[in-house]
Amino acid sequence: MANLVVRKCDGSHDVIKDCEQKMAAFCTMDPSYIEYDVDGRPHNPNNITAHQVDAMNRALQTRSPVKVWENHGLLVESLEELKAIDTDWDLIAMSDEEWDTNVKGKLAKLYQRVMRANIGASSGTKVLHLMRPRLVAIADSVVVNYLGVPTQHHVECALILAGEVRRIGRDEDNASTLAKVRQHLIKASVTESNVVPSACRIIDALLWMRANGLKRPEKAGYHRLWRQMGLASP
């Protein structure tokens, strides 16, 4: 069984077990995979539309009015700060040099452009992940709190989270786990429309399921599901 070792911001560790089976269950049983990851894909990778905002709100239970995005001038044919972000950049796979000298700064500019009044780190990264699924880590509050990421400033929060997800994914054992998970999803044919979650998204989903199960074990649907499947708790 493939495990993911998580080192949090305070130095403590956690282990997420049975990652292959849990991600397969996520892709087949969690509506957000279809409604967000699959249906929310953009036609133009540099053009955020109401479709992405609606997909986020519907699937991830976010409340971010389309009008707010329109008022901030974000729903335009080509957002320059987004255009500067290569669609092939991969948060986990890129070298430290490329991340530090080229990508991190451009990602910060994109976050500064998007995260305005009434668009925080959570909703901002959820929409931007659809535009750059290999690069943008989702700053969901459950995951942010689980890892212990500071939340005072939206841009800083999103960038720190990206660094934490990158560190988790670049661990040698975790990299092996992520490769096994992707291979399992492809082999098991559990994904839709050839949308196999990126390494970044796999980490996000596993962290979210783990954190949600720890936070509300008596209410978390995944906690019951794992028991039924004979897997380790979230």
Where is each model-derived feature located?
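An N-terminal alpha-helical hairpin/helix-loop-helix interaction module that forms a charged
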Residues: 1-115, 133-234
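Short hydrophobic alpha-helical segments that form membrane-spanning helices or hydrophobic packing faces
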Residues: 123-130
